[in-house]
C-alpha cells in the first residue's frame, strides 16, 4: 500500500503559508502578484525536482506532468488555484495545489506504475483581484 508523506505535506503547508501572510491572520495573495509569483516559483522548483515537465498556457495556468506508461493515454489533471481574496483562508485553493503536488511526488518517490500521464495544475485568477 502506498502512502503520501506527512513530512512532505507539512513542509508544503509551512512553506506556502508564508506567501502572502501579512502577519495578522489570513493570506492575501492576489492573482499574478509578487506573492502569487513566489508560490508559483516554489511550485515549479518542487515539480522540476521530481522530473515533471512544466508548461504554462496563454492564461498563465500552469501544468506539471509526469509521463505514464501509455503515451497515448489521456492525462489525469488535478489541482486548484493559489490566489486568494484579501485576508483569505490559509488553505483556500492552495490546499488543492499542494495535494496534487503530493500525488505526483508520491508516485515518483514510491515508483508507482501508472498508465496515464499525471498532471498537477495551478489555475490562474480563480478568486479575481482587487
Language-model features: locations:
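N-terminal glycine-rich anion-binding loops that anchor highly charged ligand groups
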Residues: 11-21, 39, 54, 71-76
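Alpha-helical metal-binding/catalytic segments enriched in His/Glu/Asp
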Residues: 78, 88-127
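Catalytic-core environment of secreted peptidases
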Residues: 50, 62-92, 100
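N-terminal capping segment at the start of a domain
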Residues: 2-33
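An acidic- and aromatic-residue-enriched active-site/binding cleft used to recognize and process polar
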Residues: 59-60, 81-83, 123-126
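Structural signal for hydrophobic packing residues in well-ordered secondary-structure cores
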Residues: 13, 17-20, 50-51, 104-111
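Domain-scale detector for complete catalytic domains at protein termini or as standalone homologs
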Residues: 50, 55, 69, 108-115, ...
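A non-catalytic alpha/beta surface segment that caps or lines the substrate-entry region
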Residues: 22-67
